[in-house]
Design a protein with these regions (language model features):
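Nucleotide and nucleotide-moiety/phosphate-recognizing core
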Residues: 2-118, 128-143, 149-166, 170, ...
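Conserved TIR/SEFIR loop-to-helix hotspot centered on a Trp-containing motif
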Residues: 121
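Active-site YXXXK catalytic motif of short-chain dehydrogenase/reductase
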Residues: 124
């Protein structure tokens, strides 16, 4: 049985730490802590990798009892080359069914998240790189909003390259990091549901 693979997209290195473009990496690191994940550098994958076991507790339902092995991956390539870290792990369309990629999305307001499946990259370079590397769009993603919003909570998407760069390369404020930590609990539960009950159930419950 092939492992589940959860990927958190971002750029390696200190200068990118805490930036909005690193949202996937930040969230997967927080989720890893919940599982006492021990990260190790995998030179072959050019990534930080941790092995955990995920699943609902046995009491949730006898049928769902038991936990499944999951590989957490934080690519150490730059965003545009993320596929290099994923290609050796996802070798078929079938194995892509157990892949989830967590990443930042400018088309959604900060603090929101959505599970999607089998969609285009939407211009996200990291996602584009993974799609090219594994030759399929048929995998799950957790899109996490990073765009500013109006006082009424509507999306205020930046327009123009400079404005976009300013948002994605800007660092999260401490109060925004608290919002991400809260969001990580919801995403962690969604990932557990995905592993134990399948994608449809996770989408119905968390979207």
């Amino acid at each position: 049985m092939s492992n589940y693979v959860f990927v958190g997209l971002g750029n390696p290195g200190q200068e990118y730490e805490g930036t909005r473009h690193n949202t996937g990496r930040i969230l997967l690191s927080i989720i890893g802590k919940q599982y006492d994940a021990e990260w190790k550098e995998d030179k072959k994958l050019s990534a930080q990798v941790a092995k955990i076991k995920v699943g609902l507790p046995a009491s949730a339902s006898r049928r769902q009892a038991g936990k499944s092995p999951v590989t957490l991956v934080l690519p150490d390539t730059f965003m545009n080359n993320s596929g290099k870290s994923i290609k050796p792990l996802i070798t078929s369309v079938k194995s892509a069914e157990k892949l989830v990629v967590v990443y930042d999305d400018l088309d959604m307001p900060f603090g929101s998240s959505k599970i999607s499946f089998n969609k285009s990259s939407g211009g996200h370079r990291g996602l584009e790189s993974i799609i090219k590397a594994i030759k399929t769009e048929k995998f799950a993603r957790v899109r996490v909003g990073i765009s500013p919003k109006t006082p009424t909570g509507k999306l205020k998407k930046p327009s123009g390259e400079d404005a976009v760069m300013k948002v994605i390369m800007g660092k999260f404020k401490p109060e925004e990091m608290l919002v991400l930590k809260k969001l990580s609990k919801k995403i962690s539960e969604a990932l557990e549901t995905f592993v134990s009950s399948g994608l449809e159930r996770a989408m119905t419950r968390f979207n």
